[in-house]
Curated annotation (Swiss-Prot):
CDD domains associated with the record: PurM
Main localization, broad class: cytoplasm
One GO term of the biological process aspect: 'de novo' IMP biosynthetic process
Protein name (record): Phosphoribosylformylglycinamidine cyclo-ligase
Molecular function in Gene Ontology: ATP binding; phosphoribosylamine-glycine ligase activity; phosphoribosylformylglycinamidine cyclo-ligase activity
Catalytic reactions on record: 2-formamido-N(1)-(5-O-phospho-beta-D-ribosyl)acetamidine + ATP = 5-amino-1-(5-phospho-beta-D-ribosyl)imidazole + ADP + phosphate + H(+)
Name of the gene this protein is made from: purM
Transmembrane segments: none
Cellular component terms (Gene Ontology): cytosol
Pathway membership: Purine metabolism; IMP biosynthesis via de novo pathway; 5-amino-1-(5-phospho-D-ribosyl)imidazole from N(2)-formyl-N(1)-(5-phospho-D-ribosyl)glycinamide: step 2/2
UniProt-annotated location(s): Cytoplasm
Pfam families tied to this protein: AIRS, AIRS_C
Keyword terms of this UniProt record: ATP-binding, Cytoplasm, Ligase, Nucleotide-binding, Purine biosynthesis
Length: 363
């Protein structure tokens, strides 16, 4: 058998290929890191006072002041709300959403958020866009009292179209072992309180985007339900972070037995996660003041009330199950932190469903 002579492989270009020519700009990444360092410093708290740039983030648990701590961890993303941020070219609030989705899941277990890490993946890194995103993450961390101790920025040409990106967040908190939630003494007659949401928060945006498409409106159009704002601005209203008011109420009273973060799946999927067998949450739908954005979505998309309740928060972003004799005390503690609290219903016996409704939702 004869071997065909082939010319040796030659590098493309006089000096060969570079990583930048392959689509990864290390210099842009380094520039972004330098720009975000002041943002990261603004989130420092007891236990975390280091700089980013090392191989791992450090946290001194002893400095946080816990006696018998249990660590609680959560991770989450922002979902297709990011597509609105990308299409509307507004990136400074989705970082708040990212933090909120993680730390709200910590506080429902009675945990104080300690530190946060983010993952930012994009097809083509824009340092200015990245700084806007991290500015939102830092703001969310400040609202939660959590330190931003590290993260990863991944520029991946070919994985994402230029301009597209995705975010993931990772949060770790701690609770004293004897203050973990939910408690085991939830009982018939316990009162259900609701804390107001700021709007759609970070769930249901595939349906939101479909409804907007059917409406014929664009992200720069005036929001029909929020005068003075564009549709993109209104729908990008960041998710509320409930950490500080809830921790204040937990510390001020022993009345809170359980908390539920109302995210994807709405009331019927999230409330039963914290309830014992044999008990259901009876919710008076007429007690909910439904924000205008949900009425617009329901009417424009022809979405039925039950579908709204299993997709969106419908105006209630957090649920608390409270001892009846401690309701006034808990409400006062929450109100002192600026929370709008509504009495939604009570715990009742059940055979099957974990949530039962009274009345109708005012859409």
């Amino acid at each position: 058998m004869t071997m065909e002579n082939k010319p040796a492989d030659k590098p493309v270009g006089q000096n060969g290929l570079t990583y930048a020519q392959a689509g990864v700009d290390i210099d842009a990444g380094n520039l972004m890191v330098e720009k975000i360092k002041p943002l990261v410093r603004s989130t420092r708290r007891p236990g975390a006072d280091g700089e980013i740039g090392g191989f791992g983030g450090l946290f001194d648990l002893k400095a946080a002041g816990f006696k018998d701590p249990v660590l609680v961890a959560a991770n989450d993303g922002v979902g297709t709300k990011l597509k609105i941020a990308i299409d509307a070219d507004k990136h400074d609030t989705v970082g708040i959403d990212l933090v909120a989705m993680c730390v709200n899941d910590l506080v429902v277990q009675g945990a104080e958020p300690l530190f946060f890490l983010d993952y930012f993946a994009t097809g083509k890194l824009s340092p200015d866009q990245g700084v806007d995103i991290v500015a939102g993450i830092a703001e969310g961390c400040r609202q939660a009292g959590s330190a931003l101790i590290g993260g990863e920025t991944a520029e991946m040409p070919g994985m994402y179209r230029d301009g597209d990106y995705d975010l993931a967040g990772f949060a770790v908190g701690a609770a004293e072992r004897d203050r973990l939630l939910p408690r085991g003494d939830i009982a018939e007659g316990d009162v259900i309180l609701g804390l107001a949401s700021s709007g759609v928060h970070s769930n249901g945006f595939s349906l939101v985007r479909r409804i907007v498409e059917l409406s014929g409106l664009g992200w720069k159009s005036d929001a029909p339900f929020q005068p003075g704002a564009t549709l993109g601005e209104a729908l990008l209203t960041p998710t509320r972070i409930y950490v500080k008011p809830l921790l204040a109420a937990i510390r001020a009273s022993d009345g809170i037995k359980a908390l539920a973060h109302i995210t994807g799946g709405g009331f019927p999927d999230n409330i039963p996660r914290v309830l014992p067998e044999g008990l259901a949450a009876e919710i008076d739908l007429e007690s909910i003041s439904v924000p205008a954005v949900f009425s617009w979505l329901a009417k424009t998309g022809g979405v039925e009330p039950n579908e709204m309740l299993r997709t969106f928060n419908c105006g209630i972003g957090m649920i608390a199950v409270v001892k009846p004799e401690k309701v006034e005390e808990v409400v006062a503690a929450l109100a002192a932190e600026g929370e709008k609290v509504v009495t939604l219903g009570q715990m009742v016996k059940r055979d099957k469903d974990g949530v039962v409704y009274k009345g109708t939702l005012s859409l």
